[in-house]
Amino acid sequence: MRVVVQRVRAASVAVDGDIVGKIGTGLLVLAGFEEADSETDLDWMAGKIVRLRLFADESGVMNRNVLDAGGEVLAVSQFTLYASVKKGNRPSWSRAARGEVSQPLFERFVTKLSATLGKAVPTGVFGADMQVSLINDGPVTLTIDSKVPE
């Protein structure tokens, strides 16, 4: 499982011009899956995202997590995180999980993220052509891979 986590002042996701998910201050999470991903990956990633200390404390030091900051999380599925550009100029998506595998993974990930966060996590529409808008705060942007936990 691979994610891009961005600290935002606001973020939204729209499908066909209609906003289907939005948050204020918090984290925008773009999530991609591969066939080998398991419940262990989902659990680890949900816990890691909620515990990341990406928000400033009263001293201006990034010591607070999204819960401490009273923030929200918006999750958007994004299979392109598993693109390979090693050969040629057209990305290959062969490492990305097929839709019938990745959709249940994404849904379970959002359920775990919501449970860890203690509130509902809005999402985009799986498999749809989506438009994501955000006000990146910092900017603070991280990439995290559950198979390479650095």
UniProtKB/Swiss-Prot annotation:
* Reaction equation(s) it catalyzes: glycyl-tRNA(Ala) + H2O = tRNA(Ala) + glycine + H(+); a D-aminoacyl-tRNA + H2O = a tRNA + a D-alpha-amino acid + H(+)
Q: Which InterPro entries match?
A: Daa-tRNA_deacyls_DTD, DTD-like_sf
Sample GO molecular function, one term: Gly-tRNA(Ala) deacylase activity
Biological processes, Gene Ontology terms = D-amino acid catabolic process
Q: Which Pfam families match?
A: Tyr_Deacylase
Query: Where does it live in the cell?
Result: Cytoplasm
Family, according to the entry, reads as follows: Belongs to the DTD family.
Which HAMAP family does the UniProt record give?
Deacylase_Dtd
Q: Which NCBIfam families does this UniProt record tie to the protein? A: D-aminoacyl-tRNA deacylase
Q: How does it assemble?
A: Homodimer.
The protein, known as:
D-aminoacyl-tRNA deacylase
Q: Source species, please? A: Dechloromonas aromatica (strain RCB)
Species lineage? Bacteria, Pseudomonadati, Pseudomonadota, Betaproteobacteria, Rhodocyclales
Q: Which gene encodes it?
A: dtd
